[in-house]
UniProtKB/Swiss-Prot annotation:
Domain PRD, chain residue ranges per copy: 468-573, 831-935
GO CC entries: membrane; protein-DNA complex
Database matches in CDD domains: AAA, PTS_IIA_man
Species, as recorded: Bacillus subtilis (strain 168)
Keyword flag Transferase: yes
Protein name: Transcriptional regulatory protein LevR
Gene3D superfamilies on file: P-loop containing nucleotide triphosphate hydrolases (3.40.50.300), Phosphotransferase system, mannose-type IIA component (3.40.50.510), PRD domain (1.10.1790.10)
Binding of ATP, residues: 145-152, 215-224
Domain Sigma-54 factor interaction per the UniProt entry, residue ranges: 117-348
Domain PTS EIIA type-4 intervals: 574-711
Pfam families: EIIA-man, PRD, Sigma54_activat
Function: Involved in positive regulation of the levanase operon which comprises the levDEFG genes for a fructose PTS system, and sacA for levanase.
Comment, domains: The PTS EIIA type-4 domain may serve a regulatory function, through its phosphorylation activity.
Length: 935
């Protein structure tokens, strides 16, 4: 039986007759307990238990020490299906629904306890309080700040403050969702957010509640919100607007949920998020970086983090002021997150150096990691900095363990107790007869590996890695990565370079064989992981040859285990790009420019000399597509329309999804590569985005015959009105014709001369604006355009009369949409202008059908604007009163009846009811239009 199977069976056996109370009390088995039962090394048992967690067979409970329980046992005792998204939990009590932690009473204001509450966080805390208290259900919030600045912690403090203030009930849910996990799978994203119905897609074996449902009555924290694709943002703001949703595959009834959203991003929200989504998140809160915090706050943060480490060690720390100085000025690219990592490294060094001391762990300059120590020693500002820090700490400061209550508790990031790990390894290595010096060197290099690997797990950067791994190790690791990919026929992501380079670096610095596996276990590893072992042997030869060191067999076994453990890691999949153009080097030149400027991308060039046959081109493009496809499809940028005709044949031949854009230019290639590398969009979204961005370039191309076509917009000043008119005309043109038509704006001053110059180059289809130039083309005045008839005239001028628009609203009314949306975007906070306009246009069509009238655009705009703001006032709870003192006549009563009856379905759709007085105002507009009077 394999080692992993022995461990799994032992774990199951330990709980086969256990009760739920017993399980909740002991929370599973630790790796040490299983190791003692099976007489194996604890590190090997821990390794296999984590493999079982990854394979969804065992649950990890992140207590101290970490404990494990088989999924099968948990499902049996809890009498419910275990959610496979929850393979690592903090406490089994939470799953039982009886968590004391979730229902505790919070007696102290959690926000005021934060370091910087009266300093750098004062404004952020004030904003958070205002957002929580805002009636009726609080304002959604967006937290802005660099990586590691504490956005997640701040979101959790807001949640605790809401409970403390009795805005949320004790035990209200606080759900965290990282948008980066599902950015490239809209269907799975929809399922995660809103749940799904059994059978709604492949793999949906049962009904599942989404996060919106789980967060009902509480807070949903959405981290890395900039990674949420546009489709996901639209799903979300529809829910924010209406409060209702359907599970995926469900249509029979609407579900409702009351959720306060807290979003977080490191990016500029105006460029990373849809404007329509941003309007739904009215409260933006900036979380300061470490650099933006005062020295006093940075000292307090360092003291707090040292106190947390003292709690984990269960001893007092004696910290020299130079250690404070070095730590406070060591965190550059990681903010508070890196400061925490550095504090852990210093404490680990100090712990190892003071293993034989019972009371106090001394932290001095000797305990600083080399990179921090070198930076500290090379600084010319040390005396000045130490003097400033001495105002807050003594030359030597005694720090006692900090025992937090739930209102101040920071989640532990590491799934193991670092100091327990050090003690375990020291004991093991002492049994092997190693000297204290060798043990220290071995332990410290491995501690760096553990702490640094956690800190950098989200974003690999070579420059960061170079601070603690030699460049020649990184270069060798890159070669080994290529070998592993070829031998194992799989693709590793960049983290492979990180983990393997750290391991090799640790081995080279240890310089001695550390053998803690017995013969039986090494034989099992060889037999179980044959392919990985073969690759590890190749690695051995390469490393020996390059670094001129001997690699013992036990190190090959460790390499085998490492390769196996990271084999499943994958790089984020991206859309591939093919640039195909006629000529000997046209496509290659464009691709070369793009890769040089924007870095590595799944892109390939296909140069097509004019002598190459179509069948050869097809084969060549198909082969290149297979090379660049990462499973997300391929965008094909071509120079001629004839190549675009190959799309369906290529899809059939390769099985790869393809989108094609013609008239490729270097600028277009750069735009596509930028979007693939940095925006995390799917194939369809990138295709649409590139097409949209370059349509203006195509429109500037001259017509195939005769002059270019144009509409001329005439305004008095050529400023704001001209821009709005240009936007409206652009929309009309896009709806009416695929032919490039230019929109030219001129001032009514010197109009005659301007028109003469335009006529030399353009065929003027129509003029629109404040003054008629009296030329041989139809003119549409602003009044006619706004009233509604002008839109029809312009479309007829464009199409030479071939389009006949209906008078109803089933056809999109461009003028009404443009003018209303422009205003509503500025002033609506809670409602989605686009959806509101669609809904109200549909409603007004019903009203017109019922009354047998056709309202002009001025009336439509007036009613839409008033009704949209009336719905907004319902949310804000400040409706306006109808103050007319005269008696309401029969005509107005009739309009009130029509208004109430026709508007009712839309009120139900939004879950909002407009007041009777607001409806009187709307009815009065109808009465004036139909009967010519109000009373």
């Amino acid at each position: 039986m394999r080692r992993i199977d022995k461990i799994y069976h032992q774990l199951k056996h330990n709980f086969h007759d256990s009760t739920l109370d017993h399980l909740l009390k002991i929370q599973g088995n630790s790796a040490k307990e299983i190791a003692e039962q099976l007489k194996m090394e604890r590190s090997n048992v821990s390794f296999e238990l984590n493999n079982l967690v990854r394979s969804k067979k065992v649950i990890k409970i992140k207590t101290f020490p970490v404990r494990y329980i088989p999924v099968e046992i948990a499902e049996k005792l809890f009498n419910k299906k275990w959610d496979t998204e929850m393979m690592e939990v903090k406490d089994l009590q939470a799953f039982s629904g009886n968590s004391k932690q979730n229902h505790q009473h919070i007696s102290t204001n959690p926000l005021e306890l934060m370091i910087g509450a009266k300093g750098s966080l004062k404004k952020a805390i004030s904003q958070a309080k205002a957002a929580v208290f805002y009636p009726p259900n609080g304002l959604h919030m967006l937290l802005l700040g660099p990586t590691g600045s504490g956005k997640s912690l701040f979101a959790n403090r807001i949640y605790q403050f809401a409970i403390y203030s009795d805005i949320l009930k004790a035990g209200a849910p606080f759900i965290t969702f990282n948008c980066a996990d599902y950015y490239n799978n809209p269907q799975l994203l929809l399922s995660q957010l809103f749940g799904h119905k059994k059978g709604s897609f492949t793999g949906a074996a049962e009904d599942k509640a989404g996060l919106v449902e789980q967060a009902n009555g509480g807070i949903l924290f959405m981290d890395e919100i900039h990674r949420l694709p546009p489709e996901g943002q639209e799903m979300l703001f529809y829910f924010i607007d209406s409060g209702s949703y359907n599970r995926l595959g469900e249509s029979e009834h609407k579900r409702t949920s009351n959720v306060l959203f807290i979003c977080a991003t490191t990016e500029n929200p105006s460029s990373a998020l849809l404007k329509t989504f941003l309007r739904r998140i009215p409260m933006t809160i900036h979380i300061p970086s470490l650099e933006e915090r005062s020295l006093n706050e940075r000292v307090d943060l360092t003291t707090f983090l040292l106190g947390k480490e003292a709690e984990r060690i269960k001893k007092n720390l004696s910290v020299h002021i130079d250690v404070y100085n070095a730590l406070i000025h060591s965190a550059k690219f990681g903010n508070v997150g890196q400061l925490k990592s550095n504090v852990q490294l210093v404490c680990a060094h100090g712990f190892l150096h003071n293993l034989d001391r019972n009371e106090v762990i001394e932290l001095t300059v000797r305990d600083l990691p080399d990179e921090i120590k070198q930076e500290w020693m090379s600084s010319s500002k040390n005396m000045q900095r130490s003097k400033a820090i001495s105002e807050y700490v003594n030359i030597t400061t005694i720090i006692s363990p900090i025992v937090e209550d739930e209102t101040t508790k920071i989640d532990e990031d590491l799934s193991f107790n670092l100091y327990h790990l050090i003690e375990e390894k020291v004991k093991t290595l002492m049994k092997e007869g190693l000297s204290k010096k060798d043990i220290n060197q071995y332990i410290l290099t491995d501690v760096h590996l553990h702490v640094r690997s956690f800190f950098h797990h989200q974003a690999f950067q070579k420059d960061n890695l170079l601070t603690f791994v030699e460049d020649d190790v990184i270069q060798m690791t890159k070669q080994l990565k290529e070998i592993a990919e070829h031998e194992l026929d799989c693709t590793f992501d960049r983290k492979f370079i990180y983990f393997l380079s750290m391991h090799i670096d640790a081995f080279l610095k240890r310089g001695k064989q550390i053998d803690v596996l017995n013969t039986q276990e090494t034989d099992e590893i060889r037999d179980t992981h044959v392919k990985e072992y073969r690759v590890a042997m190749i690695f051995k030869d390469k490393i020996q040859e390059y670094f001129k060191v001997a690699i013992p067999e036990i190190e090959v076994i460790y390499l085998t285990m490492l390769i196996h453990s990271i084999k499943s890691l994958k790089e984020n999949k991206r859309v591939g790009i093919i640039v195909a153009a006629h000529g000997n080097s046209t496509a290659s030149s464009m691709v070369e420019v793009a890769t040089e400027l924007l870095g590595s991308t799944p892109i390939a060039a296909v140069d097509m000399p004019l002598t190459v046959s179509p069948s050869d081109i097809l084969e060549c493009v198909a082969e290149k597509m297979k090379q660049v496809d990462e499973g997300e499809g391929v965008l094909m940028l071509v120079d001629m329309g004839s190549l675009a005709m190959l799309e369906s044949r290529l899809e059939e031949k390769t099985g790869i999804s393809i989108k094609t854009i013609s008239n490729v230019t270097t600028s277009m290639v750069l735009d596509a590569v930028r979007k693939v590398n940095y925006l995390n969009l799917n194939l369809h979204a990138i295709y649409q985005s590139v097409t949209k961005d370059f349509i203006e370039l195509w429109e500037r191309q001259p017509a195939a015959s005769g002059k270019k076509k144009a509409l001329v917009s005439i305004c008095t000043t050529g400023s704001g009105t001209a821009k709005k008119l240009e936007d409206i005309l652009t929309t009309i043109v896009n709806k009416a014709s695929d032919t490039p038509i230019h929109i030219l704006t001129v001032s009514s001053i010197k109009l005659a001369n301007s028109i003469k110059e335009i006529e030399k180059e353009y065929e003027i289809l129509a003029t629109v604006g404040t003054k008629d130039p009296k030329i041989n083309a139809p003119h549409v005045s602003l009044e006619v355009l706004i009233e509604g008839e002008g839109e029809k005239l312009i479309q007829q001028a464009i199409t030479k009369g071939s389009i006949s628009l209906s008078n109803g609203l089933n056809e999109a009314n461009i003028i009404v949409r443009e003018l209303c949306e422009d205003s509503l975007k500025k002033y609506l906070v809670f409602l989605n202008p686009h959806h509101v306009i669609d809904m109200l246009l549909e409603w007004l069509q019903t009203v017109q059908d019922e009354l047998g009238v056709i309202f002009n655009n001025a009336v439509l705009i007036k009613v839409i604007m008033h009704t949209a703001f009336a719905f907004e006032r319902v949310i804000k709870q400040n409706p306006i009163a109808f103050s007319e003192e005269e008696e309401i006549n029969d005509q107005l009563k009739e309009m009130v009846y029509v208004t109430e009856r026709t508007l009712a379905p839309y009120e139900e759709k939004l879950g909002l009811r407009i007041s009777d007085d607001e409806k009187l105002f709307i009815a009065a507009i109808f009465a004036e239009e139909v009967h010519g009077q109000l009373f």
